[in-house]
Curated annotation (Swiss-Prot):
Family listed: Belongs to the bacterial ribosomal protein bL34 family.
Gene designation per UniProt: rpmH
Entries under InterPro entries matching the protein: Ribosomal_bL34, Ribosomal_bL34_CS
Molecular functions (GO terms): structural constituent of ribosome
Protein name: Large ribosomal subunit protein bL34
C-alpha cells in the first residue's frame, strides 16, 4: 500500500506557503493568529532550505 505522505516541496509551498496564505482572507487570519502567538515560523516557506 502506498503511504499517504508523498513529500513535494513545490506542492507544499503552493498550498501552505506565505503567498498562498496571503491570497485569502482566512489565510491572512491564520498569519495574524500565528504572529500574535509569537511563532518563529509563520508558514512552511520560513523553513529556509536549499531547494
Amino acid at each position: 500500500m502506498k503511504r499517504t505522505y508523498q513529500p513535494s516541496r513545490v506542492k507544499r509551498n503552493r498550498k501552505f506557503g506565505f503567498r498562498a496564505r496571503m491570497k485569502t482572507k482566512s489565510g491572512r487570519l491564520i498569519l495574524a493568529r500565528r504572529r500574535a502567538k509569537g511563532r518563529s515560523k509563520l508558514t512552511v516557506s520560513d523553513e529556509k532550505k536549499k531547494y
